[in-house]
Amino acid sequence: HLEVAAHLYGPDDGKPVIALHGWLDNAATFSRLAPRLQGLRIVALDLPGHGHSDHRPIGAGYNIWDYAHDVLQVAEQFGWQRFSLLGHSMGAIVSVLLAGALPERVERLALIDGVIPYTGEADSAPQKLGSALEALLAVNDKRKPVYASFDQAVEARMKGVGAVSREAAEMLAQRGLMPVPGGYTWRTDPRLMLPSAMRLTRAHALAFVSRVACPTSLVLAEQGLMMQPELLELVESFPFDIRRLAGGHHLHLDDDIGAEAVARVFNSFLHD
C-alpha cells in the first residue's frame, strides 16, 4: 500500500471535503484558502509522488486517472460515502474525472483554474507513446536539481510552471523541500516530469464533464492558464457556475486578497 500524507482543516463534524493540489505542488497550496472556508472538514492531500506522500513503486506510472483511485481510497478510510472535492489545476482535473466516473459519490465540485486534462487525438498517439518510452529509458540518468539554500529553491519555484508569489513559493517549499548533501531538493518523484504515454481525446474529456451530476463552481484566474479564447469558449459552454477573479494561476495562494476572493465564492457555494 501507499502512505498518503494530508493536512486536516476544520471541525471533525464539518461537511467532508477532499482537497487536491496541482502538478508538482502539495497540500500547502490550500494553506491560505482552507482556514477561510467555514464548517468543512477538509482533508488536503499530498498526492502520491508529491510532498510527504510515498512515491509510486518502481514500474508504476503517474497517469492522471490513478489519482482518482487514491482519492477514493482516502474517502473509504474516512468512511465517507459522499463528499465534495476542492481542486486546483491538476487537482481540479482529477476532481472532474472522479465526479464523471462515479457521480453518486461526489456532492459538489469547487474548482480553481482547471477542468479537463490536456487532450491528444488518436493520430498523435503512436508518436506520444514513442516519446514517453524514450523518456522512460532515460529517467534513471536524471538527477533532481539541488539548491544551495532554501531561498534559492524558493526563487526557482517562483519562476516555475504557473509562476507564484514569494510567499506562495515559501509555503510550497516548507512542505515540499528536503535537506540533501549540498543543500535542498524537492521531495517530488522525478517521474512526475515524464511525458504522458497516453492522453484522453477531446471526446473522452468532454464525456467526463457531461456525466458530472453535482453542482460545480469554477473559479477562473484572469491571469491564469485558462484564458486562451478557444479553451475559454469551451469551458463557458459547461453547465458550471463560473467566476472570473483577478490574479494568476495560484490566486488562492499568492496573497490574502486572492484567497479571500476565492473563499467568498466557495463559502456560499459549499453551503447552498
PLM features: residue spans?
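Alpha/beta-hydrolase fold catalytic core
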Residues: H1-V17, Q38-R41, W80-Q81, I116, ...
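Active-site loop/oxyanion-hole signature of alpha/beta-hydrolase fold enzymes
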Residues: L2, V43-L86
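Conserved HGGG/HGGXW glycine-rich cap/lid loop of the alpha/beta-hydrolase fold
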Residues: H7-H55
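Conserved hydrolase catalytic core segment
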Residues: W80-S124
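A catalytic-pocket lid/entrance helix-loop region that shapes and gates access to the active site
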Residues: I112-V146
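Conserved alpha/beta-hydrolase catalytic His-Asp/Glu region
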Residues: D141-R199
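Conserved serine/cysteine hydrolase catalytic core
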Residues: M178-V235
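Catalytic histidine-centered segment of alpha/beta-hydrolase-like enzymes
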Residues: G247-A259
